[in-house]
């Protein structure tokens, strides 16, 4: 019998396959950007599978041809968590009900502040908020208007 801290083999495989299927694809935040253009740029996000557990990820503004961020990541299953190994900082995902929620490993400095990332992955969406927090607990960079909400367009 499975429990949250001890998955049987079948549940383990199911969760891993589901996560990869949901993660892979093309996303954009058109609905969010068009309803609030002064707060959110229109961004395309791509998670393109390059191997069994590897992806090439890109982010680009809709008005640009070239991405402003490009990276290769690897998905590593570790018991009841899924580790997304990222060149800057790994994300740790866990299935929570009907979604996967992820947070970054603490202690990583970016632009002179500690990186704080939170992500939610559903079957047709990807929500992310990143920010830099200084030693006084003040946000010094990142979205001031809430998370970016990406809708999945295709696989």
Feature map (PLM): residue ranges:
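Cysteine-centered motifs
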Residues: 2, 8-11
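Calycin-type beta-barrel ligand-binding domains and close structural analogs
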Residues: 2, 18-24, 30-35, 50, ...
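Extreme N-terminal tail/first-helix region
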Residues: 11-18
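Short secondary-structure subsegments characteristic of cysteine-rich extracellular domains
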Residues: 40-51
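Extracellular beta-rich globular recognition domains, centered on the fibrinogen C-terminal
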Residues: 54-59
């Amino acid at each position: 019998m499975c429990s949250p801290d001890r998955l049987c083999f079948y549940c383990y495989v199911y969760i891993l396959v589901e996560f990869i299927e949901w993660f892979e694809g093309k996303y954009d935040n058109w609905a969010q950007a068009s309803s609030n253009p002064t707060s959110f740029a229109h961004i395309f996000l791509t998670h393109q599978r390059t191997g069994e557990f590897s992806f090439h990820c890109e982010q680009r503004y809709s008005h640009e041809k070239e991405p402003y961020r490009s990276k290769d990541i690897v998905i590593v299953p570790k018991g009841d968590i899924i580790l997304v190994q990222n060149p800057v900082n790994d994300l740790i995902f866990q299935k929570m009900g009907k979604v996967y929620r992820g947070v970054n490993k603490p202690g990583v400095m970016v632009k002179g502040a500690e990186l704080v990332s939170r992500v939610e992955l559903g079957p047709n969406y990807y929500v992310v908020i990143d920010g830099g927090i200084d030693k006084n607990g003040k946000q010094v960079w990142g979205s001031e208007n809430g998370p970016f909400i990406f809708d999945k367009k295709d696989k």
